[in-house]
């Protein structure tokens, strides 16, 4: 969906706001359009999906209170975050493809929810250092009687006072009553919350460097690789053309055709006393060699260059360099990709912490859980490290530490089984209860 710059200008005037980066909105829309095109091979989508899979697969997220246990507040926050975690692979892939996604929490009927919108629907209006303190979001859209309406939400943090203002507009940016659509009737035009230290939404940003001093908006994972991608598409077109032009065909003497310019249908032909044209054969086969090796070498070279430009190790578009490699060599070969994955995970943690903070504030404001539990939560991450670590090696390390009494047995069980620490503790206790005591063993032996 595109919203033209002049419409955004009217909306910002409606809220008395100014865009910090005058070109960020148009760039974000262009990146979104490029990412969504499906008519030809989309290299940005390939990298985004690959890295999202590497980042999320076999990883878990949970929310606990400050003591590592479940509380009503932590369970409520987890309910909101898990709604977005279950589709996090898609969310991360799109964030890498277009530059970022905005996680907007809200409360409905006492339950937590989080809307996920593209950064192309956000205009940043104020910042404090690297932290967003003001933004206008195109939060929703709907239609009635064939007309399209938009709902914009303006977030502003000034000191410790957080204001959220909602306005509805027509498709040209003109203001209209907020209750124009039934689903918007109960949305308050303005909400003022005292006490928040951060803006009440999360921003999942692609870690790719935008090469600007003040990196306000995220950029796609393939940012800066336009020339390489253009050359790759040209090379693919050349390869298709090469195969098309080099198709084999058979030329036949004109005396083999009948009066309707057709060859005989059967496999038997009338013999001629004379040979073909200028003493040649009646049949001439055109079957030139295809220069696929040269074209494919060029294609592989461009693929390797694109991987380097993105900042990942070989193995996404090119062959991985892990054949007959040792574990140490495999780690070294994947170092760049793992570094990128690590940066993506850091940004995911930041976005989820921002969203959890917003849910925590909203729970207090709307009384969704008992008051007084503000800040008593923590997100527990268990990221998969198999790309860089050997599971056997890690198990041996945990076992050695446990046998020396340096870690609790439940730590080892939790790692090996994927249980929570509390579940592992109960499992260890149950297992020990089934083991005979030393006295029982001695009596049995006697």
Protein language model regions, located:
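Extended, charged amphipathic alpha-helical segments
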Residues: 182-332, 336, 368-375
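Ser/Thr- (and often Asn-) enriched beta-sheet segments in non-cytosolic proteins
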Residues: 62, 163, 177, 249-250, ...
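Extended, regular secondary-structure scaffolds
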Residues: 102-216
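Short amphipathic alpha-helical segments
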Residues: 73, 80, 84-88, 95, ...
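Short coil/turn segments at secondary-structure boundaries
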Residues: 91, 243-251, 316-321, 410-417, ...
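C-terminal anchoring/interaction modules
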Residues: 263, 268-277, 283-288, 295-310, ...
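Charged, low-complexity, helix/coiled-coil-prone segments
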Residues: 16-23, 29-38, 170-174, 234-252, ...
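Extended, helix-rich architectural segments
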Residues: 1-122, 127, 132, 320, ...
């Amino acid at each position: 969906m595109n919203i033209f710059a002049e419409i955004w200008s009217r909306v910002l005037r409606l809220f008395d706001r100014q865009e910090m980066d005058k070109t960020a909105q148009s760039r974000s829309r262009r990146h979104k359009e490029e990412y969504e095109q499906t008519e030809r091979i989309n290299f940005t989508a390939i990298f985004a999906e690959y890295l999202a899979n590497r980042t999320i697969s076999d990883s878990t997220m949970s929310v606990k209170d400050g003591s590592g246990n479940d509380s009503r507040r932590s369970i409520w926050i987890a309910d909101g975050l898990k709604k977005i975690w279950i589709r996090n692979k898609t969310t991360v892939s799109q964030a890498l493809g277009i530059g970022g996604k905005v996680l907007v929490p809200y409360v409905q009927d006492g339950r937590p929810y989080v809307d996920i919108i593209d950064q192309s629907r956000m205009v940043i209006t104020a910042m404090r250092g690297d932290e967003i303190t003001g933004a206008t979001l195109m939060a929703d859209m709907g239609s009635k009687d064939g007309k399209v309406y938009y709902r914009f939400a303006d977030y502003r943090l000034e000191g410790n006072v957080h204001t959220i203002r909602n306005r509805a507009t027509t498709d040209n940016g003109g203001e209209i009553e907020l209750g124009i659509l039934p689903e918007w009737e109960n949305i308050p035009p303005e909400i003022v919350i005292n006490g928040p230290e951060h803006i009440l939404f999360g921003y999942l940003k692609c870690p790719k460097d935008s090469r600007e001093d003040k990196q306000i908006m995220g950029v796609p994972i393939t940012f800066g690789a336009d020339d390489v991608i253009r050359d790759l598409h040209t090379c693919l077109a050349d390869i298709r053309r090469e195969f098309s032009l080099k198709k084999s065909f058979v030329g036949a003497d004109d005396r083999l055709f009948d009066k309707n310019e057709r060859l005989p249908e059967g496999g038997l032909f009338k013999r001629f006393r004379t040979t073909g044209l200028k003493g040649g054969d009646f049949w001439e086969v055109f079957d030139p060699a295809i220069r696929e090796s040269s074209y494919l070498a060029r294609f592989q070279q461009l693929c390797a260059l694109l991987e380097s430009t993105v900042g990942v190790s070989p193995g996404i578009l090119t062959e991985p360099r892990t054949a007959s490699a040792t574990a140490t060599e495999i780690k070294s070969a994947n170092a760049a990709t793992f570094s990128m994955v690590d940066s993506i995970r850091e940004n995911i943690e930041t976005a989820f912490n921002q969203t959890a903070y917003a849910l925590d504030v909203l729970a207090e404001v709307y009384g969704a859980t008992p008051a007084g539990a503000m800040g008593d939560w923590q997100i527990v991450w268990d990221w998969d490290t198999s790309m860089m670590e050997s599971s056997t090696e890690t198990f041996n390390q945990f076992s050695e530490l446990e046998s020396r009494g340096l870690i609790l047995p439940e730590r080892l069980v939790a790692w090996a089984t994927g249980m929570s620490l509390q579940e592992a503790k109960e499992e260890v206790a149950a297992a020990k209860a089934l083991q005979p005591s030393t006295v029982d063993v001695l009596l049995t032996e006697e």
